[in-house]
Structures are given as structure tokens and as C-alpha cells.
């Protein structure tokens, strides 16, 4: 892609997200979402092949439908209250429609079907942006209207998302789809605690994004997109493959890695608020995520047939500039739990 075009696309995408995060007017929020959606489509079709085109089309249709639903909710609320303000979401119909629109943009169940299909059809870098940066705008919208929406609907959707995120990844061999289902499950955890403690949702987001970035960066170094190719790179790049597997276990929530910290904090917060059944179900469903990540680790490293590697091992990375931040990201993705006593929100 032309560097000038790339810089314009990235700037527009960031501007759209910032407009959503800083606006209190429904029309400006809609404009921010539209800027965000139109800016990322060139990144999705960066590789000119039918699969990328299909993924971009699915993404566009889903996001356009969600934007239409968002505008319908805003207009319905305008007719009822006479205000465009985000804090005047009083009409119950408008509130439900707005929740549906934002969760569709976020990829929560039952509006999750586009996430694995789109992620599978695009390059790894575009998938990284889709599963990290593109979550910020709808999450900020839900964060702002949280006191005004039906929490029961959100809790049901979050529980469904955790279940779908676990079940969907069980029979997958494509790493991009596995990351997509993991993203759906993580969004479910964030939405579950949003009704109890929105700050805990931000903590979960701050941990989820570095873990996802680390995993995608390591996959890009390895040029790996399937579990089969991941197991074949063990002899060529054992260190990188080991780091991928450890980061994946962290994404699954295995203690004492970083991914366990937000799950433990969310369960603790919900238990403090006299909610017992919900965190119990969430914990049981989270075992599905941990199971398929553990299975990938087991089949990749412990059941590999011993083979002699006659090639010269090349330890240098493909792009040194891109990998300068990788050691820090790996530390954040694996070694944060010992710092938990220093976090006031957890004490």
C-alpha cells in the first residue's frame, strides 16, 4: 500500500475512534463509527485476493447494519425526549436498539458470526487491528451509556459470548479463527463486569490488548497461520514458538500468567456484589478456552516426533524495528500478576 494512503487511512481510523470516545452527541458518535469503518476497509483488502474481498464485504455489511440500528435508536430517542445527548437515553426501545447496535459492532454473541469469518480472511496485521483497536470505539460507547441500559440483557449476552468463544475454538486449526473466538470470550468477560465495576472492564482491556498484540506479532515473525505450521516451526525458531505457546496459555487464563489476573479480579468483584451463579458459570465456560490453548501447546511441543534440523538456524528477526517493543509486550503478557498488590482496584 502507498505510504501516503496508509498514513491517511490510519489517521482517519484513529480520528474516528477518538471522536466516538470524546463525543456526547449521538450524531457525532455515528460519524466517528462511520469514519472508523470506512478507514479500515482498505487495510482489510490490502492483499488482493477473493478471500480478503469477501471478508471486507462481510465486515462492511455488518458494521453498516449496526450503524443504521444506532442511528434508528438515536432518532427514536430524539422523538421521545427531544435531545441528542448520550446521557438522555430514556426510551426503553431506543436503549435496547442501542445495546444491539454497539454489541454488534463489538462482536458479542448473538451478533458474533462475522468476527471469525472476517479475521480468517484478512492478513495478520489487519487481524491485529480488528481485534484490538476496533474494539475501543464500541466499548467506550457501552461504557458511557452503561447506567442507562438493561444490565440483564448485557449479562445474558456476555455469558453467551464466553460460551461461544470457548466452544467455537475447540475444533479449529486456523490460528486466526482461534484468536477471533478468544476475542469474543474476552469481550464477554468485559461486558459481564461492566454492570458491576466499569473500571474493572478497563483493567481487562488494558491486559487483553498487549496479550493479543504479542501473540499476533510472534505469529507474524513465524509467518504462521495454522496449528500444523506452528508445530513445524519448532526446530527453526524454538524460542519464538515457545513464546507463542506461553502467550496463548496466558490468553486462556492459566495461572500464574497475566491472563489469569483479570479473570480472578472479575470473579472477585462479582462475588463481592452477591453474584454467585454468574461467576461460577463464567469460570466453568472459561475452561473451554484454556482447554483448546492447552491442547495446542501439548500437540505442538510435547507430542512432536523428534527430527534432525540440518538447516542453519537464523536468529535474526525479519524486521528489527518492528520487534523493538516485543520484549516489553512479552513481559506484560506473562509477568504482571506479581504486581497485583500494587493495583488499588484489586485491593
Curated annotation (Swiss-Prot):
GO terms for molecular function: NADH dehydrogenase (ubiquinone) activity. One of its GO terms (cellular component) is mitochondrial inner membrane. GO terms for biological process: mitochondrial electron transport, NADH to ubiquinone; mitochondrial respiratory chain complex I assembly. It catalyses: a ubiquinone + NADH + 5 H(+)(in) = a ubiquinol + NAD(+) + 4 H(+)(out). InterPro entries: Complex_I_Subunit_2, NADH_DH_su2_C, NADH_UbQ_OxRdtase_chain2, ND/Mrp_TM. Its EC number is 7.1.1.2. It is found in: Mitochondrion inner membrane. It is a multi-pass membrane protein. Pfam families: NADH_dehy_S2_C, Proton_antipo_M. The chain crosses the membrane at residues 1-21, 25-45, 67-87, 111-131, 144-164, 178-198, 201-221, 237-257, 274-294, 326-346. Signal peptide: none annotated. Keywords: Electron transport, Membrane, Mitochondrion, Mitochondrion inner membrane, NAD, Respiratory chain, Translocase, Transmembrane, Transmembrane helix, Transport, Ubiquinone. Coiled coil: none annotated. It is an enzyme of class 7 (translocase). Core subunit of respiratory chain NADH dehydrogenase (Complex I) which is composed of 45 different subunits. Interacts with TMEM242. Belongs to the complex I subunit 2 family. Core subunit of the mitochondrial membrane respiratory chain NADH dehydrogenase (Complex I) which catalyzes electron transfer from NADH through the respiratory chain, using ubiquinone as an electron acceptor. Essential for the catalytic activity and assembly of complex I. This is NADH-ubiquinone oxidoreductase chain 2. It comes from Myotis simus.
Amino acid at each position: 500500500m502507498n505510504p501516503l494512503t496508509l498514513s491517511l487511512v490510519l489517521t482517519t481510523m484513529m480520528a474516528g475512534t477518538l471522536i466516538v470516545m470524546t463525543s456526547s452527541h449521538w450524531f457525532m458518535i455515528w460519524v466517528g463509527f462511520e469514519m472508523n469503518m470506512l478507514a479500515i476497509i482498505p487495510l482489510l483488502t490490502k492483499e488482493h485476493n477473493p478471500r480478503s474481498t469477501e471478508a471486507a464485504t462481510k465486515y462492511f455489511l455488518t458494521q453498516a447494519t449496526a450503524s443504521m440500528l444506532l442511528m434508528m435508536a438515536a432518532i427514536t430517542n430524539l422523538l421521545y425526549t427531544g435531545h441528542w445527548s448520550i446521557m438522555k437515553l430514556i426510551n426503553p426501545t431506543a436503549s435496547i436498539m442501542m445495546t444491539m447496535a454497539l454489541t454488534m459492532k463489538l462482536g458479542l454473541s448473538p451478533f458474533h458470526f462475522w468476527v471469525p469469518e472476517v479475521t480468517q480472511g484478512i492478513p495478520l496485521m489487519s487481524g491485529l487491528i480488528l481485534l484490538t483497536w476496533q474494539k475501543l470505539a464500541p466499548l467506550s460507547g457501552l461504557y458511557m451509556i452503561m447506567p442507562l441500559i438493561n444490565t440483564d440483557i448485557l449479562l445474558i449476552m456476555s455469558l453467551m459470548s464466553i460460551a461461544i468463544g470457548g466452544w467455537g475454538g475447540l475444533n479449529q486449526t486456523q490460528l486466526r479463527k482461534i484468536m477471533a473466538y478468544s476475542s469474543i470470550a474476552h469481550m464477554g468477560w468485559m461486558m459481564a463486569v461492566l454492570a458491576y465495576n466499569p473500571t474493572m472492564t478497563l483493567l481487562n482491556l488494558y491486559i487483553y490488548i498487549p496479550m493479543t498484540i504479542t501473540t499476533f506479532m510472534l505469529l507474524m515473525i513465524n509467518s504462521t497461520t495454522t496449528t500444523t505450521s506452528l508445530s513445524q516451526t519448532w526446530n527453526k525458531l524454538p524460542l519464538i514458538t515457545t513464546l507463542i505457546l506461553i502467550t496463548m496459555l496466558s490468553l486462556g487464563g492459566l495461572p500464574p500468567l497475566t491472563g489469569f489476573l483479570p479473570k480472578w479480579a472479575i470473579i472477585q468483584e462479582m462475588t463481592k456484589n452477591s453474584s454467585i451463579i454468574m461467576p461460577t458459570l463464567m469460570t466453568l465456560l472459561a475452561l473451554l478456552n484454556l482447554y483448546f490453548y492447552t491442547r495446542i501447546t501439548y500437540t505442538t511441543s510435547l507430542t512432536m516426533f523428534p527430527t534432525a534440523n540440518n538447516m542453519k538456524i537464523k536468529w535474526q528477526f525479519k524486521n528489527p524495528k518492528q520487534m523493538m517493543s516485543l520484549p516489553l509486550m512479552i513481559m506484560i503478557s506473562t509477568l504482571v500478576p506479581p504486581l497485583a498488590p500494587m493495583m488499588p482496584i484489586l485491593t
